[in-house]
């Protein structure tokens, strides 16, 4: 794939952009097999590949420059000058067109980007999410205060007329002078408050603050793989810890008698419940609880426990708790293989029966890994 930003060295986030994709896959595969050296080579399944371009459904743009010449993108690592990334080839063509329009719309609307040195201005970030199923967008303006809302509201009709696919628009208030992406307060500027996405026939509800996978093509295969593994095992009861908006639980519910999804973020749980209602699933229960606290409060484990923790992993305490609960099966999905490997050391009673990785972020070193662990 050719990327002008990478060739000009203005953005080097995709560190392996110049490496042929087949070679990227081979390098990652070898690195993961080396990291998990205790896993039998025969346990590894073929990796799930990504499209090399137009594969991301989310864009997180820093608002830079001045009101008369705003830029959506990043700061140059050389001299700090603003670099526009609105035409990043990882985004869909529709997303690129909308981002380019927004960059000009911000200028004509007179919305000043926030200057972190002078601590002046309003617009900090523009966050864009696209539903591949419906082609609709959720657009969030992260601003320092409510001072910019009047200008945003006044100019919204022009934006919506130009891009009617923008279904959800909100302003997130982030007043703190820190490199924090978003604040607590979300002000909706449209009647619609969420997007509808669909993977493998399963509806998914996407709200502003809920975590959602960035690569829909690969995410769909991740969920389908977990569903297929669970379908083979046919557990009586299954827990989905760190369930987010319910992607794994919703896919696996038809193949278990009872599924319980646990997630600390209430907004994500509300999304998961709405998806379950749309599917008409009655053997699935979601609760807004801390996954570690829920697990530690149980005296008897489910037949199968699926975990999908954040980058920090499960940690020693929760890993040891799962070891003591002695569930027959664990499915561990991880966005950080290093912490996953550390957690597996605290699960000595389990053998890795199946391992597969998913190239969620092509052209980088990152990989999503999922393993089926069986109690020995």
Swiss-Prot record:
Q: What is its EC number?
A: 2.1.1.189
Q: Name one GO molecular function term.
A: 4 iron, 4 sulfur cluster binding
Task: Locate the active site.
Answer: 335 (nucleophile)
Q: Kindly report, in one word, the top-level EC class recorded for this enzyme.
A: transferase
Q: Where does S-adenosyl-L-methionine bind?
A: 213, 242, 263, 308
State the superkingdom: Bacteria
PROSITE patterns referenced in this protein's UniProt entry, alphabetically: SAM_MT_RNA_M5U, TRMA_1
Q: Name one Pfam family in it.
A: tRNA_U5-meth_tr
- InterPro entries for this protein: 23SrRNA_MeTrfase_RlmC, MeTrfase_TrmA_AS, SAM-dependent_MTases_sf, U5_MeTrfase_fam
**Example GO BP:** rRNA base methylation
The reaction(s) catalysed by this protein are: uridine(747) in 23S rRNA + S-adenosyl-L-methionine = 5-methyluridine(747) in 23S rRNA + S-adenosyl-L-homocysteine + H(+)
What keywords were assigned to this record?
Answer: 4Fe-4S, Iron, Iron-sulfur, Metal-binding, Methyltransferase, rRNA processing, S-adenosyl-L-methionine, Transferase
Ligand binding ([4Fe-4S] cluster): 3, 11, 14, 88
Name the job this protein performs. Catalyzes the formation of 5-methyl-uridine at position 747 (m5U747) in 23S rRNA.
Cross-referenced NCBIfam families, in alphabetical order? meth_trns_rumB (TIGR02085)
Please report which protein family the annotation says this sequence is part of. Belongs to the class I-like SAM-binding methyltransferase superfamily. RNA M5U methyltransferase family. RlmC subfamily.
PANTHER family, per this entry?
Answer: RNA M5U METHYLTRANSFERASE, TRNA (URACIL(54)-C(5))-METHYLTRANSFERASE
Q: What is this protein called?
A: 23S rRNA (uracil(747)-C(5))-methyltransferase RlmC
Species assigned in the record: Vibrio vulnificus (strain CMCP6)
């Amino acid at each position: 794939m050719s990327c002008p930003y990478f060739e000009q060295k203005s953005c080097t986030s995709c560190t392996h952009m110049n490496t042929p994709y087949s070679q990227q896959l081979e390098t990652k595969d070898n690195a993961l097999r080396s990291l998990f050296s205790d896993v039998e080579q025969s346990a590894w399944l073929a990796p799930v590949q990504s499209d090399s371009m137009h594969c991301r459904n989310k864009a997180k743009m820093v608002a830079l420059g001045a009101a008369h010449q705003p830029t959506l993108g990043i700061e140059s690592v050389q001299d700090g000058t603003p670099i526009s990334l609105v035409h990043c080839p990882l985004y869909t063509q529709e997303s690129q067109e909308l981002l380019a329009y927004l960059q000009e719309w911000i200028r004509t609307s007179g919305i000043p980007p926030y200057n972190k040195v002078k601590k002046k201005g309003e617009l900090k970030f523009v966050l864009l999410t696209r539903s591949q199923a419906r082609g609709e967008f959720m657009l969030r303006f992260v601003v320092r205060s409510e001072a910019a809302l009047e200008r945003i509201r006044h100019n919204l009709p022009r934006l919506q007329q130009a891009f009617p696919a923008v279904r959800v628009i909100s302003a997130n208030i982030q007043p703190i002078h820190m490199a924090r992406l978003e604040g607590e307060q979300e002000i909706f500027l449209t009647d619609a408050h969420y997007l509808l996405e669909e993977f493998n026939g399963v509806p998914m509800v996407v709200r502003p603050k809920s975590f959602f996978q960035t690569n829909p093509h690969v995410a769909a295969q991740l969920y389908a793989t977990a569903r297929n593994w669970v379908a083979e095992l046919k557990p009586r009861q299954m827990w989905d810890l760190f369930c987010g908006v319910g992607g794994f639980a919703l896919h696996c519910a038809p193949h278990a008698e009872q599924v319980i999804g646990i997630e600390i973020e209430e907004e994500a749980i509300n999304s998961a419940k709405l998806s379950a209602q749309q599917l008409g699933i009655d053997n699935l229960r979601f609760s807004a609880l801390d996954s570690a606290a829920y697990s530690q409060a149980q005296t008897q484990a489910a037949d199968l426990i699926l975990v999908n923790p954040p980058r920090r992993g499960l940690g020693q305490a929760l890993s040891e708790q799962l070891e003591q609960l002695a569930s027959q099966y664990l499915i561990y999905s991880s966005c950080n293989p290093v912490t996953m490997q550390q957690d597996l050391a605290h699960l000595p009673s389990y053998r890795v029966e199946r391992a597969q990785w998913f190239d969620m972020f092509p052209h980088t070193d990152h990989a999503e890994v999922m393993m089926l662990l069986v109690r020995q």
